[in-house]
UniProtKB/Swiss-Prot annotation:
Pfam families: Zn_ribbon_10 (PF10058)
An MF annotation (GO) of this entry: identical protein binding
Name under which the protein is recorded: Endoplasmic reticulum junction formation protein lunapark-B
Any GO BP: positive regulation of endoplasmic reticulum tubular network organization
Lineage of origin: Eukaryota, Metazoa, Chordata, Craniata, Vertebrata
Species of the source: Takifugu rubripes (Japanese pufferfish)
C-alpha cells in the first residue's frame, strides 16, 4: 500500500528542492547563532552567580561562624578551596555541551551546502539557459557578483583598419607638445591673414615623429586659409609609421584555424608588441623574432629597442680559385730552373782553369 501511495506522490522540482534546502540552511544558521548566544549566556551567568555566592558565604562564615581553633578553621576553609575548582569544571562541561551541538549543526550545514552545490551543477548541465540563469541568480550566492563584473567596462582590443584611423587616439594627443595656452575671451576674433581670411592653428605632430611631418605641420600652422578648406598635405600619407607586425583578426573562419593549427601559427603562438612609452598595441610578432625585433610605435613614434641582439653565425672561409693559387705560390718548394741558370751554376772541368785556359 505504501508503494502505491509513493507512486502518486509528485516529485519535487529543482526549484522546490532548492527552496527547502535554503530554508533548512537558514534554520541551521539561526540555530548556530542562537547556540553561541546561549553558550555565552550560561557561562556568564554561572561565573556571575557562583562568584556572588562565594563572596556572600565567605562573609557570612567569617562574621558569624568562624571558630577559634585553627584546625576547625582549616576544616571550614577547605570547601572554599574546592568551590572554585568545582565551578571551573562546570564551566568546562557547559562549553563541551555547546561545542558538540555546534559541531553537529555545522556538519548538517556542510551537507546541505554540498547538496545544494550538486543540484546547481546539475541545473547548469540539464536546464535551458534561461531557466538555469534564473535559478542561479536566485539560489547561487556568487550570482550577485556577476552583474558587477559585467558592468565593469572592458577595453576591447582594437585592430587597425583601412586608412589607419586607430592611430589618431588619445595616446598620441597626450604626447603632443602643447604650446602656450592663449586666453580666449568672449567675443574675441581669430587672427586674420593678409587677405582677411581667418587663420586656423594646426597642432604639430607628436614628438619623435618623422621630420618632414613636423616641418609640414609647422609650415601649415600659420598659413592663412578660410574655414572648412582642406589642409594641404594632410591625408596624403598615413598619420604615423606602419605597425611593426599585423594584428590577427578575431573572427577567423574554420579553414583559417585549421591552417593555423597545421602551420603552427595563430594568436596563441605570437607575442604582442607593446610600446614601452604609451603601452599601445603594435601588432603580434612570432616567437622566434619577438626578442630580436626593434620597432617604432605607430602612435607615439617611440623607438622600442630589441630585447636581445641577434646572434651572428661564424663567417665561412672563402674557397675561390685565385686565393688557392696565391696559397700555392706562397708555399716553399723546388722552383723550376732554366737552361742558362744550369750552365752558369755547373762546376768547371779539371782541364780548364778559371779563365778558360787548358
Amino acid at each position: 500500500m505504501g508503494a502505491i501511495i509513493s507512486r502518486w506522490k509528485t516529485k519535487l522540482t529543482t526549484v522546490e528542492q532548492l527552496e527547502n534546502i535554503d530554508k533548512e540552511i537558514k534554520q541551521l544558521e539561526e540555530f548556530r547563532a542562537k547556540n553561541q548566544r546561549l553558550q555565552k549566556l550560561w557561562v556568564g551567568r554561572l561565573l556571575l552567580y557562583s562568584s556572588a555566592l562565594y563572596l556572600l558565604i565567605s562573609l557570612f562564615v567569617y562574621l558569624l561562624y568562624l571558630p577559634e581553633q585553627w584546625l576547625l578553621r582549616l576544616a571550614m576553609a577547605l570547601p572554599f578551596f574546592i568551590y572554585p575548582v568545582l565551578v571551573w569544571f562546570i564551566r568546562r562541561f557547559l562549553i563541551f555541551l555547546f561545542s558538540k551541538r555546534s559541531e553537529r549543526n555545522n556538519d548538517k550545514l556542510e551537507d546541505l551546502k554540498a547538496t545544494k552545490k550538486k543540484i546547481l551543477e546539475e541545473v547548469m548541465e540539464t536546464e535551458t539557459y534561461k531557466n538555469a540563469k534564473a535559478i542561479l541568480e536566485r539560489f547561487d550566492p556568487d550570482a550577485k557578483k556577476k552583474p558587477e563584473l559585467e558592468a565593469t567596462p572592458v577595453r576591447p582590443q582594437m585592430t587597425p583598419g583601412a586608412g589607419q584611423e586607430l592611430r589618431q587616439r588619445g595616446v598620441a594627443l597626450r604626447h603632443m607638445p602643447m604650446g602656450t595656452p592663449v586666453a580666449v575671451t568672449p567675443g574675441a576674433r581669430p587672427p586674420l591673414g593678409p587677405g582677411g581670411t581667418p587663420v586656423e592653428r594646426v597642432p604639430l605632430s607628436a614628438p619623435g615623429g618623422p621630420p618632414e611631418r613636423s616641418g609640414l605641420a609647422a609650415s601649415v600652422q600659420m598659413t592663412p586659409r578660410s574655414l572648412g578648406s582642406p589642409v594641404p598635405g594632410v591625408g596624403m600619407h598615413p598619420p604615423g609609421p606602419p605597425l611593426a607586425r599585423p594584428v590577427l583578426p578575431k573572427d577567423r573562419g574554420a579553414v583559417d584555424r585549421v591552417i593555423e593549427y597545421l602551420v603552427g601559427d595563430g594568436p596563441q603562438n605570437r607575442y604582442a608588441l607593446i610600446c614601452q612609452q604609451c603601452f599601445s598595441h603594435n601588432g603580434m610578432a612570432l616567437k622566434e623574432e619577438f626578442e630580436y625585433l626593434a620597432f617604432r610605435c605607430a602612435y607615439c613614434y617611440f623607438l622600442n629597442p630589441a630585447r636581445k641582439m641577434r646572434p651572428q653565425a661564424p663567417r665561412l672561409p672563402e674557397f675561390n680559385f685565385e686565393k688557392r693559387l696565391r696559397a700555392e705560390s706562397s708555399t716553399p718548394g723546388p722552383a723550376p730552373h732554366s737552361a742558362t741558370d744550369t750552365e752558369e751554376s755547373a762546376p768547371p772541368s779539371r782541364g780548364m782553369d778559371k779563365h778558360g785556359r787548358a
